[in-house]
């Protein structure tokens, strides 16, 4: 890449930072936005070329944001400094999409409402997480909690952990959600069995299970809509 074009050789109005300042961030493509985060390229490679290489290696922006420290630093020319910039960007994205509702009530009226709340965070996880969303009698979210990490099965997912927290929060209803790191949200037999077990326990406790949402990479499935609840 000895003859690679340097950023200073690109017409000023076409450089990522200048384009953003002149025309707005929404006019930049993913490579240009990532270039602004990374700031500089590597030896023999300008920052736009580096950004394009990363996007190509990880098959798009979602792959870059899902990459681990080891994944990123395995790329030639990428040290811990640049890797930390990418990891920080990914974490900010997750936190932005995570439920942070100190100043407003969030009411869950449909599976789409819940998916919009948690999909951005959970679709990027590489490990299965079982999250419980606690609601009051008006379906307003009063809290969330990750109650289990790892592959779900009925022998290790205990309803008592879920309902203990629900009682502590005076929750009238709950929704459970977990992700499939494979990207396919199709429910397994274990997913269905866990759902039915929690539903039965909820009926005994007087705390209604409204739904079980399974999050995949590009979508979600509601077990209520599938007729299991």
From Swiss-Prot:
Pfam families: RadC, UPF0758_N
MPN domain mapped to chain residues: 107-229
Residue interval(s) of motif JAMM motif: 178-191
Signal peptide: none
Protein keywords: Hydrolase, Metal-binding, Metalloprotease, Protease, Zinc
The keyword Iron appears for this protein: no
GO molecular function: metal ion binding; metallopeptidase activity
Any Gene Ontology biological process: proteolysis
Residues that hold Zn(2+) according to the record: 178, 180, 191
InterPro entries: MPN, RadC_JAB, RuvA_2-like, UPF0758, UPF0758_CS, UPF0758_N
Keyword Secreted attributed: no
Protein family: Belongs to the UPF0758 family.
Record's protein name: UPF0758 protein CLL_A0562
């Amino acid at each position: 890449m000895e003859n690679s074009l340097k950023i200073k050789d690109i017409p000023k109005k076409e450089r990522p930072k200048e384009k953003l300042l002149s025309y707005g961030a929404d006019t930049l493509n993913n490579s240009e936005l990532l270039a602004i985060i990374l700031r500089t390229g590597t030896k023999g490679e300008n920052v736009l070329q580096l950004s394009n290489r990363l996007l190509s290696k990880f098959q798009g922006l979602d792959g870059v944001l899902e990459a681990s420290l080891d994944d990123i630093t395995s790329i030639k020319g990428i040290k811990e400094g640049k890797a930390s910039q990418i990891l920080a960007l990914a974490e900010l994205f997750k936190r932005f999409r995570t439920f942070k509702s100190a100043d407003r009530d969030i009411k869950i009226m449909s599976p789409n409402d819940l998916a919009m709340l948690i999909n951005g965070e959970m679709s990027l996880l590489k490990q299965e997480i079982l999250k419980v969303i606690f609601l009051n009698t008006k379906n307003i979210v009063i809290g969330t909690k990750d109650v289990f990490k790892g592959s779900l099965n009925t022998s290790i997912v205990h309803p008592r952990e879920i309902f203990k927290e629900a009682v502590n929060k005076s929750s009238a209803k709950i929704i459970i959600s977990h992700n499939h790191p494979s990207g396919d949200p199709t429910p397994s037999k274990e997913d269905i069995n866990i759902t039915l077990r929690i539903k039965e326990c909820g009926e005994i406790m007087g705390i209604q299970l409204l739904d079980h949402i399974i999050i995949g990479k590009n979508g979600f499935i509601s077990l209520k809509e599938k007729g299991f609840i």
